[in-house]
Amino acid sequence: AYRQFAYINFEDNEVMKDVFQKDFDVERILMAIQLVTGIVVDTETLIIFDEIQEAPRGLTALKYFQEKAPQYHVVAAGSLLGIAMHSNDSFPVGKVDFMDLYPLSFSEFLEAVGQEAFARLLAKKDWGLIAAFRSKLIDLLKQYYYVGGMPEVVNAFINHKDYAEVRQLQQTILDSYDRDFSKHAPIAEVPRIRMIWRSVPAQLAKENKKFIYGVVKEGARAKDFELAIEWLIDAGLIYKVSRVKKAGIPLSAYEDFSAFKLFLLDTGLMGAMSGLPPQALLEGNVLFSDYKGAITCLLYTSDAADELDGV
């Protein structure tokens, strides 16, 4: 346990943003932290560097904390770290531990909105009892598909139960991603990144069995958009899911790299990009049928088996 923490957000702190430019003298950096936060850093202090990708050489500095001052514990967080690790910064390989954070899963959403009993029920896979509460679970699943799992959005939904506020926050997040394209991506790739990003809902709404470059731009070829897709994957904004030739073990051995689909990182953001209205929550199973299953679970069965497997 820590007695206190010293928090630095490099996105809105111009003084600290350049603190690593001169050198990596840990004592000098600790003094700067004290001057900015008013916290005297000791071994019972957790140092938090937020949006570390905004600080030039910030990632490199972590190496020197680990090598020269391991008694101090540092947590570094940030968006687009996958992109930052491909920049000119020297990444401290072997000096840091990773923890990836994702949008809330359905079970985590249930726990967050006070439905822990249903989360436990699903974890136990008591299919008889699950069937008995089918209607309630479907309503909760609809909520999840609309709200999604972005922490700020879920927190607002818990506090206010306002679907209009949910959509407004989701749109704000989408707008911030769009700004990040211009800020962090190679200038030449920005237009293609935006085209790929904006095409995802339209791609998933079609009957296509794979991603079609012609939907992005008429006459487009794979090589024109490969870097844009990789940038979005590195940024953690989309998932690339390849087709498999058969459901064997290990699944990766049967991956068909020539055919894939792209999915957004969050179901709520997917709905916001698609313009899905709150009324969809009341319209039967529209949330499950629209977008060809892109925001719901999928089932697989082989011709030789009667079993259904979740995918």
PLM features per residue range, with description:
Residues V41-A55:
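Conserved P-loop NTPase "ATPase switch" module shared by AAA+ and STAND
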Residues H86-A202:
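Interdomain motor-coupling "hinge/lid" segment immediately C-terminal to the ATP-binding subdomain
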Residues E67, S79-F91:
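Signature of the SF2 helicase/ATPase Hel1-core->accessory helical subdomain module
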Residues A305-D306, G310-V311:
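Positively charged, low-complexity/disordered segments
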Residues N159-A304:
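Accessory nucleic acid-recognition modules appended to NTPase machines
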Residues N13-I39:
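Short glycine-rich substrate-engagement loop in P-loop NTPases that contacts/grips substrate
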Residues Y2-V15:
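Conserved catalytic segments around the Walker B and adjacent sensor/switch elements
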Residues H73-S79:
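Structural recognition of the conserved hydrophobic beta-strand(s) that form the central parallel beta-sheet
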